Amino acid sequence: MSFLELARKRCSIRKYAPKNVEQEKIDYILEAARLAPSAVNYQPWYFVWVQSAEGKAKLQECYPREWFKQAPYYLIVCGDHQQSWKRGDHKDHMDIDTAIATEHICLAAAEQGLGTCWVCNFDTELCKPNKYP
């Protein structure tokens, strides 16, 4: 599929099938994220894959939407301000870098036939990545 076909295919999905995703697809998606460009190649991100029932229940407290509860997995994209590049006027590029990595994830998932949806309107105090087994 061409890039434009992939870009047309990728959209926010809010209804998910209750099935497992093959490990090969997960690895492929994470590799696409790892290859995402970042300012000065600092790669100030890390990813938390949440698949346990306990972890999913905790994460659902951060974003209590019915459609969100249907997803078989969650991938939390986290950024580290201590590792991100700051330009001369102190603009921190962590948000830009993690957004690029996130879209790499979404495009790779679409290519693999998987649906994704960015979630940005979550409770930041409840959503701490070390809380999700």
Report the location of each language-model feature.
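Acidic, surface-exposed loops and disordered segments
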Residues: M1-P133
